[in-house]
Amino acid sequence: MDSAKLIFINQINDCKDGQKLRFLGCVQSYKNGILRLIDGSSSVTCDVTVVLPDVSIQKHEWLNIVGRKRQDGIVDVLLIRSAVGINLPRYRQMVSERQKCD
């Protein structure tokens, strides 16, 4: 199994189509299996229909997403987890440090 690349939402457009990604985002909207996540001024649309039966989504909730980027820029979600209580500054620092090592 291929590992997911840990990124920020604003880096999704720079990733290859089909690439497996992992990122954190705040729920801006959710309707009919389509999720809009934001982080600062960046946003991404995610299709959660594959995991839909197992998903409970609340507006403004922070979510940890693993999915594949489609050609149209939407991310097909493979795994979704709540990130309630996450220390955002520490998380951002950890992602930046990890990216420097990759």
UniProtKB/Swiss-Prot annotation:
Superkingdom of origin: Eukaryota
Entry annotated with the keyword S-adenosyl-L-methionine: no
Keywords for this protein: Chromosome, Nucleus, Telomere
Keyword set includes Isomerase: no
CC terms in the record's Gene Ontology section: chromosome, telomeric repeat region; CST complex; telomere cap complex
InterPro entries for the chain: NA-bd_OB-fold, Ten1_fungal
Subcellular location per the Swiss-Prot or TrEMBL entry: Nucleus; Chromosome, Telomere
MF-aspect GO terms: single-stranded telomeric DNA binding
Pfam family, one: Ten1
Any one GO biological process: telomere capping
Entry function: Required for telomere maintenance.
Subunit structure: Interacts with stn1.
Protein name: Protein ten1
Native source species: Schizosaccharomyces pombe (strain 972 / ATCC 24843)
